């Protein structure tokens, strides 16, 4: 290829390290879609496992991109689209096939609400990326429940169903419909929720933190549904705690900005 001066221009080459985060994002997308495929075949454990693995990969791609200095606009857009499918569309379809299809009315509407609210939450997040004033983010909080966490919370009835040896009460469409709509509302809410990206561990606590991660991994392997149920319940309980913590931050900021 030649420019106007007749000199050859080398085609722009992308370093391999820049492709690694995007490859992880695509893997998360594939796992989310694979969850739908397993749900169609009534393989509920595999469906849940696929979407949970997608959530783990989603938590890795951004950090790996920063570690490799491979952040890009393309990667950010791909991550958002992947999240919408893996944590909005896929959970909605799985819940519909598992329970909501048995509702006499509005079962599909509840599933759509979860998928649409996930898309709206991601759109709001993207629209605020370049915004200068983000009170929640500057204080270390998210606005509303993030998409991966929302998917995990939406699956609480399925976790209970599996833990209780598939008791039909947890699969009943009325329970699942109400819960799905509640989680959909949390995703688009303006409630402050803790952002684990803002967590800083003191140096003297590093070994304890690593031991905790190892124990969590062991629990996830030996009793996955009980562990995921406990984790989702803990996250849900922490929402009012985060609300109280942010209220303290607001009062502190108001006091600092007030007259001396």
Regions found by a protein language model. Name each.
Residues 1-59, 242, 260:
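Topogenic membrane-insertion module of multi-pass membrane proteins
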Residues 1-9, 139-260:
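C-terminal membrane-associated helical module and adjoining short loops/tails
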Residues 14-22, 74-82, 142, 195-205:
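Short, amphipathic, aromatic/basic-enriched membrane-interface segments that mark the entry/exit
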Residues 33-36, 53, 57, 91, ...:
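Alpha-helical transmembrane segments of polytopic integral membrane proteins
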């Amino acid at each position: 290829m030649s420019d106007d001066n007749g000199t050859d221009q080398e085609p722009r080459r992308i370093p391999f390290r820049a492709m690694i985060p995007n490859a992880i994002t695509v893997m998360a997308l594939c796992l989310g879609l694979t969850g739908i495929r397993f749900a169609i075949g009534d393989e509920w454990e595999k469906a849940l496992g696929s979407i949970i693995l997608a959530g783990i990969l989603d938590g890795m791609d951004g950090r790996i991109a920063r570690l490799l200095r491979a952040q890009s606009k393309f990667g950010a857009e791909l991550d958002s689209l992947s999240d919408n499918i893996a944590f909005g569309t896929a959970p909605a379809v799985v819940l519909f096939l598992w329970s909501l299809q048995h509702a006499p009315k509005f079962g599909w509407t509840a599933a759509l609400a979860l998928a649409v609210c996930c898309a709206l939450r991601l759109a709001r997040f993207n629209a605020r990326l370049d915004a200068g004033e983000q009170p929640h983010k500057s204080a270390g909080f998210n606005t509303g429940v993030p998409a991966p966490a929302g998917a995990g919370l939406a699956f609480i009835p399925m976790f209970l169903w599996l833990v209780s040896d598939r008791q039909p009460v947890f699969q009943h469409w009325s329970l699942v419909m109400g819960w799905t709509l509640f989680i959909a509302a949390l995703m688009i809410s303006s409630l402050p929720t803790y952002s684990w990206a803002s967590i800083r561990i003191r140096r003297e606590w590093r070994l304890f933190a690593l031991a905790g991660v190892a124990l969590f991994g062991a629990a996830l392997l030996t009793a996955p549904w009980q562990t995921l149920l406990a984790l989702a319940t803990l996250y849900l309980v922490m929402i009012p705690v985060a609300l109280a913590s942010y209220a303290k931050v607001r009062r502190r900021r108001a006091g600092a900005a007030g007259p001396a």
